[in-house]
């Protein structure tokens, strides 16, 4: 695939207009705002930095690297083990439901784009969008580092725009937050991708509590 086309497809994967429910989930932020843990843009930035460092860098990116290698090797057994590990790291029913819902939605796109995707891989991709991204990245010859940039930007933008609705703060503040969070992400992405097996795992008790409490929150803008 020519390089310009790869770049355009990478931008398409980063777009939050993809019909995978990117704006439908708050990952506990809605309860954190309700509880008074996140009251302004500075508190949101601190909250999101913690999620990035203690969850996204500790689980999502290391597992993306392993799923990518499994897809390169055509090894669905290895991909299945890491997909199951990813789901086990989602500490609440809400987070596991989000993972599976986004995976199922992304797989519908994947099958439309690549109808030759084998059935055993489709089944795995339905469990997690991360698995689908890895498979598609290998098929489209997009490097794992470029794929990680796309995934990270989409995650950051979704979180910041959720904050616009919930905290709230304005659009100018949102763009400043995206720039600062992206700078932090870019500085640490490579080391996160190189995380050894024994170091994979997250410890975000406040985020887990917020997600669990959000399941029964009286009034919600976001899915549970």
From Swiss-Prot:
Keywords: Chaperone, Cytoplasm, Nickel insertion. It comes from the Bacteria. It is found in: Cytoplasm. It comes from Escherichia coli O157:H7. One of its GO terms (molecular function) is nickel cation binding. Pfam families: UreF. UreD, UreF and UreG form a complex that acts as a GTP-hydrolysis-dependent molecular chaperone, activating the urease apoprotein by helping to assemble the nickel containing metallocenter of UreC. The UreE protein probably delivers the nickel. The gene is ureF1. This is Urease accessory protein UreF. Required for maturation of urease via the functional incorporation of the urease nickel metallocenter. Belongs to the UreF family. GO terms for cellular component: cytoplasm.
